[in-house]
């Protein structure tokens, strides 16, 4: 579906089963959630299932910003300290829960993640560090041999194999399709999706009263900022510091191909996955791509490297290139919760929101509606950035 058609479609009645509301919010709290990427969509959904009256405000279309350009590897790899690892791990489990709640419209591939490298000692040490770090925390990851790799990924060309690991709990999804499924589930629960550009958050005394947009004012008891890289501007209005730094990511997307791979594959310097629609997605090890441009030439090069790893993709054709700007906090850790001045304004900004969105949605429903500060988010409060 064209994302530009999404708003009118969502305006139509949506039928289907909906998960039981566990505990209603008191006095039908009115909550505005700004931003309908995966983070905002999850928060809105979880608030609505608690009985809140939720308005989800999006300036463009759901999943049209950072979410659209995400590689969408669901994992808790190389996340330290333990509290950050645990938040991501809760996110993995949360996606499995959401599949049960939402149903088949939320497609996730649970094939695990596999990384390997050549004989370079530094790369080998890095891979072994990953397993040695996470196994004591209970993460289902293990070192693998070349034979293991070739058994797990039939037809793979391993090259000069030095070391590898296999994480069985990891998954991946199409970020746009998954976010739309969350938005639709939220609407079934009572979320109102509104296309508008938020200019200001409005205040009276020590509380936010709503927002002013290009479509007029909206009133609420709580405001949640989940606006991706625009969270810095909006947070500043509420006195909440949300320092983000630029981190770009380029991905090559192929035209649809027959099903070939169900894992996330990470040979040295390359990331490979296949979406449910058959498109191969390739990037370069999740780092900031700097001054690189998303040119067709770069896309062709990435897909050529894919064929070097998966010979069955011979003949693969480039469809599109995407350039994304990650929501990367200055210290690389999530920025979660309310500020000091206005206790009913909350912010949610992090990388990777794709993994942790289900957990954040569940935790924010508690924090916003019950006024409880959850233990899982204590290490990630905005207060650490106050002067």
Predicted segments with their positions:
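N-terminal Rossmann-like FAD-binding beta1-loop-alpha1 element of flavoenzymes
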Residues: 31-55
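Short hydrophobic core segments
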Residues: 34, 218-228
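Glycine-rich FAD pyrophosphate-binding loop
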Residues: 49-67
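Flavin (FAD/FMN) cofactor-binding and adjacent substrate-gating region
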Residues: 93, 97, 118-189, 194-195, ...
């Amino acid at each position: 579906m064209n994302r530009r058609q999404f708003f009118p479609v969502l305006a139509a009645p949506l039928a289907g089963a909906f998960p039981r509301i566990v505990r209603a919010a008191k006095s039908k709290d009115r909550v505005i959630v700004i931003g309908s990427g995966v983070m905002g969509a999850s928060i809105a959904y979880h608030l609505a299932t608690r009985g809140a009256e939720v308005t989800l405000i999006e300036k463009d279309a759901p999943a049209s910003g950072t979410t659209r350009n995400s590689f969408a590897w669901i994992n808790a790899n190389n996340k330290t300290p333990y509290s950050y690892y645990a938040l991501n791990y809760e996110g993995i489990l949360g996606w499995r829960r959401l599949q049960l709640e939402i149903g088949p419209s939320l497609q996730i591939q649970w094939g695990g993640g596999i990384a390997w490298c050549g004989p370079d000692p530094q790369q080998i040490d890095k891979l072994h560090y990953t397993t040695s770090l996470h196994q004591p925390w209970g993460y289902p990851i293990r070192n693998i041999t070349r034979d293991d790799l070739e058994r797990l990924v039939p037809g793979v060309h391993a090259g000069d194999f030095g070391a590898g690991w296999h994480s069985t709990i990891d998954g991946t999804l199409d970020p746009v399709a998954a976010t739309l499924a969350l938005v639709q589930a939220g609407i079934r629960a009572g979320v109102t999706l509104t296309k508008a550009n938020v200019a200001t958050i409005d205040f009276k005394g020590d509380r936010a009263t709503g927002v002013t947009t290009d479509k007029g004012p909206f009133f609420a008891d709580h405001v949640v900022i989940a606006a991706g890289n625009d969270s810095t501007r909006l947070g500043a209005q509420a006195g909440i510091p949300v320092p983000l730094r630029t981190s770009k990511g380029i991905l090559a997307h192929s035209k649809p191909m027959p099903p070939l791979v169900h894992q996330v594959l990470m040979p040295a310097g390359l990331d490979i996955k296949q979406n449910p629609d058959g498109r191969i997605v390739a990037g370069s090890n999740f780092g900031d791509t700097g001054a690189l441009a998303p040119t067709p030439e770069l896309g062709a090069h990435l897909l050529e490297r894919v064929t070097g790893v998966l010979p069955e993709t011979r003949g693969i054709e480039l469809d599109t290139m995407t350039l994304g700007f990650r929501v990367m906090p200055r210290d690389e850790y999530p920025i979660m919760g309310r500020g000091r001045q206005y206790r009913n304004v909350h912010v949610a900004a992090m990388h990777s929101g794709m993994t942790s969105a289900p957990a954040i949605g569940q935790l924010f429903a508690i924090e916003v509606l019950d006024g409880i500060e959850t233990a899982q988010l204590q290490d990630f409060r905005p207060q650490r950035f106050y002067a």
